[in-house]
Amino acid sequence: MVLSQTLQTVQDVEGVLTEMVRIGRTCIVSIPNFGYHQLRRMLAETGRAPKSAGVLHYEWYNTPNIRFFTIADFEDFCREKNIRVHRRIALDTEAQAEVLEHPNLNADLAIFVISRA
């Protein structure tokens, strides 16, 4: 099963992920990283909700995004909910490169391979 850049729009994150790992033995989840340094900088410099290409191209009032979480938040969630992370790939989509150092700060997207622990 694959869930691509939609988890931030889901009302019941725990329910969706629990069902995913129950039904599909190994699942792939990609998430936008709202801890990305460019988003942090935009918010700090302008005092306004950040906008960028991808999932943040909406205005604050019409965005489908209801959850703003980071790579670190998702990893903590998986640990707390007994979801095993087999692999994490953190990406800088603008540079089209994998991020190895400080992914919570330097990656705008992450892909996780998960299953029940």
Predicted regions mapped to residue ranges:
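Helix-to-beta-strand junctions that scaffold the AdoMet/dcAdoMet cofactor pocket
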Residues: V10-Q11, R22-R25
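Short, hinge-like loop/turn segments at secondary-structure boundaries
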Residues: M1, A44-R48, N104-L105
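Conserved class I S-adenosyl-L-methionine
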Residues: G15, T26-A53
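Class I S-adenosylmethionine-dependent transferase superfamily signal
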Residues: L17-M20
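A C-terminal cap/extension of S-adenosyl-L-methionine-dependent methyltransferases
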Residues: E75-A117
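Structural motif corresponding to alpha-helix initiation and N-cap regions
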Residues: V10-E14, I71, A97
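Acceptor-substrate binding/catalytic loop of class I
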Residues: S52, L56-D73
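A short SAM/SAH-binding and catalytic strip from SAM-dependent methyltransferases
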Residues: M1-D12, I31-P32
